[in-house]
Amino acid sequence: MHTPVLFEHPLNEKMRTWLRIEFLIQQMAFHPQIASHADALHFFRNAGDLLDVLERGEVRTDLVKELERQQRKLQSWAEVPGVDQERINELRHQLKQSSSTLMAAPRIGQFLREDRLIALVRQRLSIPGGCCSFDLPTLHIWLHMPQAHRDEQVASWLASLDPLVQSLSLILDLIRNSALFRKQTSLNGFYQDNGEDADLLRLRLDLAHQLYPQISGHKSRFAIRFLALDSEYGIVPERFDFELACC
């Protein structure tokens, strides 16, 4: 029985930021019912990391530009004979709607940034053990509030990210589905190719080989080196087949 493992690697800084945002929001939403100190630290640590990422660049501007670019791509696809016009029109409508919603929304992450509890916890996360009850009595008492109260507050925090989530999910879904997986073969653990202006590499490896990729490159050219999980006794086959999509 084959167990495929998917690896994704960004080929530009914009995609790197988007994948990090997606990952952090998924972590925040994974267990929205905060019932313990461990649950709280998991949520607040990811919320703090998300705010750090959002503060580094013009995320909204980049997303709006990408939504417009995807609309232009769909417009060109609409002129291809035999294409599913209904599906294309549906996607174009979703892109326009997401763009309008994103443009009308407040500054991304501002609702989280202005929350007093998130700000207090965020300040202490950089200190080893800095979230003990004597360091953060506010968090301590919050964790003793009724579960329904905490659930409602977490739901409002996550809901404030909806315009971002909606746009980012649509963009990443379109990019991920823009290319098919094709079988490739590495020689002595190495593979390289042209990026063809791709934004994202997606690799599927069989878990049985216990190999992982080390990827370097950019949109015009990239290289992949396969390494054994067991660095001491693991073996990298002379010829290794894997699946690759340049999106």
From Swiss-Prot:
It comes from the Bacteria. One of its GO terms (biological process) is FtsZ-dependent cytokinesis. InterPro entries: ZapD (IPR009777), ZapD_C (IPR027462), ZapD_sf (IPR036268). One of its GO terms (cellular component) is cytoplasm. Its main location: cytoplasm. Disulfide bonds: none annotated. Gene3D superfamilies: YacF-like, YacF-like domains. Keywords: Cell cycle, Cell division, Cytoplasm, Septation. It is found in: Cytoplasm. Interacts with FtsZ. Cell division factor that enhances FtsZ-ring assembly. Directly interacts with FtsZ and promotes bundling of FtsZ protofilaments, with a reduction in FtsZ GTPase activity. Belongs to the ZapD family. This is Cell division protein ZapD. It comes from Klebsiella pneumoniae subsp. pneumoniae (strain ATCC 700721 / MGH 78578).
